[in-house]
Design a protein with these regions (language model features):
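A short alpha/beta connector and helix-capping loop motif
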Residues: 102-122
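Bacterial N-terminal signal peptides
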Residues: 5-16
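Short beta-strand and adjacent tight-turn residues that come in two discontinuous sequence segments
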Residues: 119, 149, 209-211
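Short histidine/acidic/glycine/proline-rich micro-motifs that form metal-
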Residues: 122-126, 189-192
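C-terminal active-site subregion of NodB/CE4 polysaccharide deacetylases
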Residues: 19-93, 98-100, 154, 158-248
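Charged helix-capping and loop-helix junction motifs
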Residues: 129-136, 163-168
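Residue-level detector of structured alpha->beta connecting loops
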Residues: 66, 113-115, 143, 205
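Acidic (Asp/Glu)-rich catalytic clusters
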Residues: 106-113, 131-148, 216
C-alpha cells in the first residue's frame, strides 16, 4: 500500500491550474483500452490486456488529478457550438466490446459516476467473450456512449465498395436499431483508414471518427482523431507519463 501511495505521489503534479470550463477548440485526450484482464500466457497481443488492478489505479489517479471524463459527443459539441466542457476533460474509450469492459471497466467507472465510450464491433455482441446487449443497455443507462466499430472488424482499406458500405453504415444502423441511441461516432478497426474510408464514414452520417494515431484529439481533424493507447505494460507510472508528456 505504501508503494502505491508513493507512486501516486510521484506522478501527482501534471498540469497548471486552469479555469473551470475549457474554451472552444481545446485539444482533449482520448484514452484507448481493450481488455481489462490479466493477459493469458498464450495471448498473441499481450499489451492489449490491462490488469484490473492497474486500471483501478489509473482511474484513481485521474480522479486525484481532477480529470473529468466526458463522452465524445460532449467534446464534439464543445468544438462545434462552444458548449462548455468541465475542467480537464478526458474521454475513456474501449474498443471491440470485450466482456471485461463491463465486468471490470464499467463497474470501476460507476463508482465515480463517470461515462465511458464503447466502440462496438457488432458481431462481438455474443454470449462468450463479448458484451451481451443487456449489459450494453446498463452501460447506456449509466451515461456511456455507444459508437460503431464496424460489423466484423476488417481492414477497411482492403474491402470492396459494397462491403465498405455494409461495415460502416450497416454497423451504425444495427446499433441504432438495437439500442435506440444516436451512434454519432466511428472507430476505425486497427486504425486503418484512407480517403475512401473517410468518405464512406462521412456518407453514413457520422460526425467524427477515432484512430489509433497517438496524440491529443484536435478539432481540425474530426475524422482522424488521435487517441492515447494504454498498454498492459504501462502500469501507473507509464500511464501518467503519457498524459504528462502530451500536456507539455
Amino acid at each position: 500500500m505504501l508503494r502505491v501511495a508513493a507512486t501516486l505521489a510521484a506522478v501527482s503534479v501534471l498540469l497548471p491550474a486552469a479555469p473551470h470550463a475549457f474554451i472552444r477548440k481545446t485539444p482533449v485526450p482520448i484514452l484507448m483500452y481493450h481488455v481489462i484482464a490479466p493477459a493469458p500466457a498464450i495471448a498473441p497481443y499481450r499489451d492489449l490486456y490491462v490488469k484490473p488492478s492497474d486500471f483501478v489505479l489509473q482511474m484513481r489517479w485521474l480522479k486525484r488529478q481532477r480529470f473529468h471524463p466526458v463522452t465524445l459527443q460532449r467534446v464534439y459539441d464543445n468544438w462545434t457550438t462552444g458548449t462548455p466542457l468541465p475542467f480537464r476533460p478526458i474521454v475513456i474509450s474501449f474498443d471491440d466490446g470485450y466482456l471485461s469492459q463491463y465486468t471490470r471497466a464499467y463497474k470501476t467507472l460507476l463508482r465515480y459516476r463517470w461515462p465511458g465510450v464503447e466502440n462496438i464491433e457488432v458481431n462481438f455482441l455474443q454470449p462468450f467473450g463479448g458484451l451481451r446487449p443487456w449489459r450494453v443497455r446498463k452501460m447506456i443507462a449509466a451515461g456511456w456512449e455507444i459508437d460503431a466499430h464496424t460489423l466484423t472488424h476488417p481492414d477497411l482499406t482492403h474491402v470492396s465498395a459494397p462491403r465498405l458500405v455494409r461495415e460502416v453504415a450497416g454497423s451504425r444502423a444495427a446499433l441504432r436499431h438495437r439500442f435506440h441511441v444516436p451512434v454519432n461516432f466511428f472507430c476505425y478497426p486497427s486504425g486503418r483508414y484512407d480517403a475512401r474510408v473517410i468518405a464512406e464514414v462521412r456518407r453514413a452520417g457520422f460526425l467524427a471518427a477515432t484512430t489509433t494515431n497517438y496524440g491529443l484529439a484536435r478539432p481540425p481533424g474530426l475524422f482522424t482523431l488521435d487517441r492515447i493507447r494504454i498498454n498492459g505494460s504501462d502500469g501507473l507510472a507509464g500511464f501518467a507519463s503519457k498524459l504528462q508528456g502530451l500536456a507539455r
